Amino acid sequence: MAASGTTTKNVPSWKVSGDWFDVCKCNMPCPCEFAQAPTYGDCAGVLAWHIKKGQYSDTVLDGLNVLGLGSFTGNIWAGEAKDATFGFFIDEKANEQQRQALQMIFSGKAGGFTAEFAKLVGDIRGIEFAPIKFELADDLSYWTAEIPGKVLAKAEALTGPMTPPGKRVQTINPHKT
């Protein structure tokens, strides 16, 4: 994950980089990653972000986590999504300035990639603060994101017949910001 943005003179420059994973009810690999319709016509999933390095103006965001829960019907990337809703959980470790910054970034109000994503979703149901556990295997073989008692999302890396032992299938977005 690497994203940044600037919108108006009232919104400071920002940049975050780290890990972004998602899991949903669709077949693997997720059709959304390739701008295709959901496997069963609708999607319900969890997006997890771990910010390794980030800033919003002078506010440091390093080490914080954000989880998003969303659902929609139709191909979201083709502009055909209906009933698209999304809600966020922001790491309770964040102080007040960090909370405000993360709300601006992930609601899309700070511009950049997340603003484009927010346009696709339309209905953001709310933002809550919660303890978020995020775990990623060093070899990328699995990841887990959890809000105890509320959300558990976990996945294992894709492998295939042509994947060398110990290596993982990865989709890389070459876009640089």
Indicate residue ranges for each PLM-predicted region.
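Short Fe-S-cluster ligation motifs
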Residues: 54-66
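Bacterial Sec-dependent signal peptides at the C-terminal "C-region" and cleavage site
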Residues: 1-5
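Internal, well-folded beta-alpha domain core
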Residues: 63-177
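N-terminal ordered "arm"
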Residues: 8-56
